[in-house]
Amino acid sequence: MLIDRFESLEAYFASPYVAGVSERLRIENKILEHGDAGLHAHCWACSRVEQLKINPVRTEYGLQWREALRCPQCMLTARKRFGLHLLAESMQPGAPPPYLTEQVSYSYVAARKHWPKLVASEFLPTLTQRLVQSQKLKFLTRSLRANARHEDMTALTLGDASIGGMLSMDVLEHIADTPAVLREARRVLVPGSPFIITAPFLNGSQSTSVRAVQEADGSIRHLLEPEYHGDPLDPAGVLCFYHFGWDLLDGLRNAGFARAEMVFPWDPHFGYLSEQNAFVAFA
C-alpha cells in the first residue's frame, strides 16, 4: 500500500504529497470515466481483485471517495477496507488479536476472517440494546452463537497490555471525553502495538473544532449547529462532538503513546483515493 506519513501539520504542508494533489485529481477524473464498468482493484479484505462501484460524493470541496468504491463481495467501502489493511500492516508479528470498536457490521465479518480471535464490541449500555443487536449479529455472521458485546471506550473491561492492535473507525468523534479514550487505548495495548483512528479531520487546521461539550450533569451544550451522523444501530443518528485537527497527535502523545502520526494512502491498486486518512499511534 502506497502511503504518506506525517508527524505535524508543518511537515504535511511542506511535503510532495500536498504538491501532488493536481496529478491525483487528474487520475481520479479519469477513473470517473469508467462509470458503470467500475474500478478493478485488489480488495484487501477479500484478498482478490474485485470490481468496485464508482460512486464518489460531490461536495463543495470536490469529490469525496471516503465512503465510495464499495466491494460487492465484502460490502466494505474504501474507508473500511483501508482501516483493516492499515491495521494488518501496522501490527507486530506474533501479536495478540486486535480489538475492533464495532461488531454488528460488515467490517467485523471481514476482520474475523483475518483474525479469528478478534475482540469486537458496540456501545450497548442496556440489556434491550444488547439483545436486539445480538439478533442482528447472529443474522450477519450466520451463527446462532454470536452475541453482541458491550464496551464503553472510556472504561474498557479489557486487561492491561492484552491486545495487539486497536481500530476505531468513525467512532471517536461521538465520544465527549477524548482523553479518557486515548488513555484506555494505551492501557490495553501491548507495547509497540498500533491504535488506528479514522474520524472527521481538518487537514489544514492544527486545532480541533469542538462542536459540543458534555456538562458535568450529563447535559449537552452545543457550540455549533448540531451535527448528527448516520448510525446503523440508531436511526436517529449520533451526535458529533468533534472535527479533529492535528492536535489529536499531541493528545495521543500525552496519553503515553511513543509515536503518533497522520497517514494518507493514495493507491488506486487497492481502491484508495483522495480523502482517506487515519491517525496512527504506537504504544
Language-model-derived ranges and their functions:
Residues 1-155, 159-161, 212, 267-282:
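Conserved N-terminal segment of class I S-adenosyl-L-methionine
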Residues 166-167:
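Hydrophobic beta-strand segment of the Class I
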Residues 170-174:
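A short His-aromatic
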Residues 4-19, 27-41, 141-143, 148-150, ...:
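S-adenosyl-L-methionine-dependent methyltransferase catalytic module, highlighting the catalytic core
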